[in-house]
Amino acid sequence: MTSEMRDLSREECLELLADSGVGRLAVSGKDAPVIRPVNYAFDQPSQSVVFRSAPGSKFYALLRQNTAAFEVDGVDQVAHSGWSVVVVGATEEVTNPADVRRLEGLGLAQWAPGDKPHWVRIRAWTVSGRRITASPPGPADGSDSG
């Protein structure tokens, strides 16, 4: 089996972000990096990853540091293929009433229990991604068992 890896264009990355719903949020914790899964939406008008949060360590770490990384991916373990998109950017609480109303209209369902009254946005500084695809062995690589 051979594989090929290629970089994704920004447009491909944004499309994958828009089509997915769960990713991993990475922030610097007090003593070590902290990575948490979050369900999210991609807000097209602001080109931002948005999610709900409750007051607590993750929320306050985001606002205190004003920076985070966010990763989303898709993997096919049988086909040995997949993709990954990483967003790095500034974090901010969304407080503008018009923006909050627009985000409420995205239909982001809350997965985790508890009240999550705060909207957080990651405004992307960088968006990058990669895709790996695998091809079955064949005559071209000399491994045809036919």
Each model region followed by its residue ranges:
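Short coil/turn motifs at secondary-structure junctions
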Residues: D43-P45, K58, V94
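Short, surface-exposed beta-strand-loop junctions and turns on beta-sheet-rich folds
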Residues: D31, S57-F59, P136
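Short beta-strand segments
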Residues: S20-A54
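Charged, gly/pro-rich active-site loop segments
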Residues: T2, D73-G146
